[in-house]
Amino acid sequence: DSLAGFSEFEVPVSYPDANLGRQLSGLAALLAAGMPLHCVSMSADGSYDTHSDQVAEFDGSLKLTCDAILAFQRDLESRGLQDRVLVELWSEFGRRPEENDTGTDHGAAGAAFITGSRATGEMVGEFPGLTTLDEDDNLRHTSDFREMYCSLLEQWLGQDAGPIIPGAGSLGRPKLVRS
């Protein structure tokens, strides 16, 4: 309670009682206090490595993550900071479409989401379908994840992606951020 007198540390919205919710609440307070942050990394609660019991594990984990991010967005909006933050959600691996009893194995293709008041909300790539899997029974990629990083570096952080992303010169730049 020693921070109770500082308005930036008062939480104006209710966050889920989970690690990600507490981390995002603290991040909102740091931003409200004027901390000059440009990039922060956090891990979501729950298990997304669903080789078994996928429906229950994935649904519960995804709900916790979505509820925490929604609370964070509402918190930023209440503090007038919504245009200062962009959130990228991603996994380092996808899932294969075929079930192995009650779950799925690691796969090559996955999804990423960009959220925030300045995110365009555009879908990049196309759903590859379930009838044209690759030779290892993975979903086929329909976009290169490096394009997303090039776009975020240039459109959000104002940095040239060339020195950071190998082969950036030959990659597209989907519009991910509104001016």
Where are these regions (language model features)?
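Ligand-binding pockets and gating/stacking loops
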Residues: 1-179
